[in-house]
Amino acid sequence: MNILLTNDDGIEAEGINTLAELLSKYHNVTMVAPENQRSASSHSITIYEPIIVKQVKKPYNIEAYSISGTPADCVRVALDKLVPDNIDMVISGINKGLNIGNDILYSGTVSAAIEGAMYKVPSMAVSAQFIKNKKENYKIAAKYALGMLNRLKKEDLKNDVVLNLNIPFCSEEEIKGIKVCKVGNKIFNTRFSEEIDEEGNKVLKLEGDINKDIYEGTDVYYIRNKYVTLTPLHYDLTNFNILEETEQLFLS
């Protein structure tokens, strides 16, 4: 397959390069990624500034470009200008940290994959759980991403599909299997610490703790039980459950 590879951690991040090295052994890979760290960019795009594109050399045989924009910008620029007619699938990742539960709304990694689907290209986001002071398990995540890709044939790929793949932090032997499941609830209970700087301004720092309320059958539940999770996503935000009710409420 011809694969467009992107991320939100930046073009020099270990995750994307681990995945690129493995995928390039079996597929044609073009890497288009942010020049700097752009985590939690969500689906933001660059409007008021020019986007700078630079070709980057990689030690494996792929074309690579850095973009002075967001993850969504990378996909837009790639599919409009750099490789407009030659991509079978967009893969975003490997992200440093999970993208499960409500966190997918903030994720530049997932949003880049969704942008691919908006261009009618099947897409997959890949994320690996990160635990502070421990070595990331990118090689395991890359192996699972390749395994998912190898199960697909071009004719199997629907152009509006977005697959969200997450790999828990554990040894490959400890992984219990793969679960196709729904998105869970929030992972963290958010709060801000507050300080006062020398000029009397409030300085807020994001903190929080792990949300212990877990719904069974969700990606959050299965990741915590050492399963790889795969969730099909879509970008239609319409709440169909109350569409008719809303019409009756406001138009009747």
Curated annotation (Swiss-Prot):
Q: Which UniProt keywords apply?
A: Cytoplasm, Hydrolase, Metal-binding, Nucleotide-binding
**Cell compartment(s), UniProt:** Cytoplasm
Tell me the residue numbers annotated for binding a divalent metal cation: D8, D9, S39, N95
Give the Gene Ontology MF terms in alphabetical order.
Answer: 3'-nucleotidase activity; 5'-nucleotidase activity; exopolyphosphatase activity; metal ion binding; nucleotide binding
Q: Which reaction(s) does the protein catalyse, per the Swiss-Prot or TrEMBL entry?
A: a ribonucleoside 5'-phosphate + H2O = a ribonucleoside + phosphate
Enzyme Commission number: 3.1.3.5
Essential cofactor(s): a divalent metal cation
Enzyme class, first EC level, given as a word: hydrolase
SUPFAM superfamilies associated with the record: SurE-like (SSF64167)
Q: What is its main location?
A: cytoplasm
- Name the Pfam families on file: SurE
Cofactor binding, per record: Binds 1 divalent metal cation per subunit.
Gene Ontology cellular-component terms for this entry are: cytoplasm
Task: Give the HAMAP family listed for this entry.
Answer: SurE (MF_00060)
Q: What does this protein do?
A: Nucleotidase that shows phosphatase activity on nucleoside 5'-monophosphates.
UniProt lists the family membership as follows: Belongs to the SurE nucleotidase family.
Which named protein is this? 5'-nucleotidase SurE
Q: Which organism is this entry from?
A: Clostridium botulinum (strain Langeland / NCTC 10281 / Type F)
**Name of the gene this protein is made from:** surE
